[in-house]
Amino acid sequence: MEELFEKVVRTLKDEGLSALSRKTKSYIKTRNIEKQAKNNQVFRDVLFINGCGEELPHPTRYRVTHQREQLEYYGMTSSEVFFKHLSLDMVRLYRTFVFFRCPYTEEINEFILKARELNKKVFYDVDDLVIDTEYTDQIPYLDTMSMEERKAYDDNVRNMGKLLKMCDAAITSTTHLQIELKKFVPEVLINRNTASEEMGCLSEKALRLKKSKSTVDIGYFSGSITHNDDFEMILPVIIEVMTFYQEVRLHLVGELDLPPELLEFQNRIIIHPFVDWKKLPELIAEVDINLAPLTDTLFNKAKSENKWVEAALVKVPTIASDLGAFKEKIVNEKTGILCTDIGEWKNALITLIENSDKRKEIAEAAYQYCKQYCMTYKKGFELVDFLRKHLKKNMLIVLPSFEISGGIMVALTHAKIMQKRGYDVSLACINAKIHWYGDNQQIPVLLMNDKMLDGEWDIAVATMWSTLKNVIEYPKIKKRCYLVQNYETDFYQIGDPLRRKANETYAVVSSINYLTISKWCQNWLKKEFGQECKYVPNGIEYNQFYNNHNERKFDRKKKIRILIEGDCGSYYKNVDESFKIINELDKDKYEIWYMSYNAEPKEWYRVDRFLHKIPYEKVAEVYQECDILLKTSILESFSYPPLEMMATGGMVVAVPNGGN
């Protein structure tokens, strides 16, 4: 709060009330976006992490807001957050991350390491050569900074370069930027700046408000004080035409120092303060000629063609330096005029001042081109295609709950295996209360409903009958799978309506890929439902249960310890029969342990020790302490407890069924 107060005071003192108002609005907007991102917990495709503060709104608008709009037009969802408010938990809520002009921080380093652990890709976006002081040293304005300010600026530049090198690839706005960025990362996409829908609407509105006038207005919309040298380059020409043509007026917009040489024309100079971008189209539309000079430096060659596009959308012709993006995008004498020296600048200005038809001809051609090729809805495919090509396949495994059972453990094991194989794996549950599953190997957990999922999935896997509906109904899934682990119809007694609901999941005709962990399940799925089903064999964590000291030595002087395992609340587990058998045994010879993940023992059960919700990693110790496992469940597709008991050296008494 103290830091925020200091910024308010400094802005008010140095830049005035209008700047404070503008930055306050930007700050509030940014915080609202971040609050939404933290609170809504919605899974989306892309998170843009913005490294520019409220003092630089225009780069953020083009490289974050407009690129987000491009993605939306082509089916990818996104959110944004200011880099200082990035939280580690956000890594589970997105497929990929785009850092825009962000400096390296320890928090971001931790975030990227976690993203790599989860097989998620990280990109860097930058629209200026602010990644190495080799480039920024070419900005003359920086030499006017104090030593303290310059050090802070240079440190920030170096940290941006450091973060860039950590990313998988980069996205940028111009060819020269692409060339330089390839020195830092192996692959760089050029995604040129585009105009948003709102920009288009505001530009059309500004066009309708245009009025005829007797003056010829020239505009220089610098945007930044670092462009002082660019304007000074054409200053002699400006002075000459303003001296000769009395009808010429000069509009200066943004952070620019007015040269003393222009003071004699101050009655024909209109100075506009830095304006909100929404007012810029109307302001540009007031002029007849747009000036876009750039001194010939590598830093300037990397700059985008924004100023040309903004002017073209309100049918104002541009005279620009013949370098960088201007040279690439403007067709000389057709959609603009390109200049290489002062003489050409003079000729271009004279031509457009004297020839209104030429102004209209160039302006119309530029307008038509930019409407066709420079709008977000027209230019999103390459960005979406680039991101999708780089992303690892992602997989959503849908669970009914996280209550431990054999079926849940199987699904979780497959999730771990697929993550180790390089998949971007997430778990989903309707009533998930946790954000992460696992300790040593963490897997993101998401809420499974339409309001909380808004991203694409390559594969989604239903794990129990109750989860198939979610997988079928969520639209953004390329491949739908159903991991059948039992004949769940018989989980319910005759007359229960859930029997029908479970049974119909085995008869889905649509494009569901059936998988199973049991040959028994594979057979009845084919025979009774006509489903071709892939067999995914189960296994146990053998090393967790087996060791060289597992051989039992039954001591006749001690009681034989019998373990009963299963949920007595599920009738098909048939735990009651186990305890009916126990009641026939001699109490003096047999000690009874009962292990359940859910229900507690019934009053009539004879239990010497009750083991409730034992963590899976501790289960082997329970088996090792017991001599015999008694398993009377009537329905098993692949029964883990008998295998695990045998692996620890114990004996098993079980009902013969498909799983035993």
Q: Where are these predicted regions, by residue range?
A:
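Short hydrophobic beta-strand element within catalytic cores of glycosyltransferases
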Residues: 292, 310-320, 651-654
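Conserved acidic donor-binding segment of nucleotide-sugar-dependent glycosyltransferases
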Residues: 332-343, 351-357
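Membrane-proximal helix-turn-helix segments that form the acceptor-binding/catalytic region
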Residues: 113, 147-169, 449-456, 495-516
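Nucleotide-activated donor-binding/catalytic signature segment of Leloir-type glycosyltransferases, i.e.
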Residues: 254-286, 596-620
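A charged, aromatic-enriched C-terminal amphipathic alpha-helix characteristic of glycosyltransferases
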Residues: 357-387
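Conserved donor-binding/catalytic core segment of Leloir-type glycosyltransferases
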Residues: 47-49, 209-231, 235-239, 251, ...
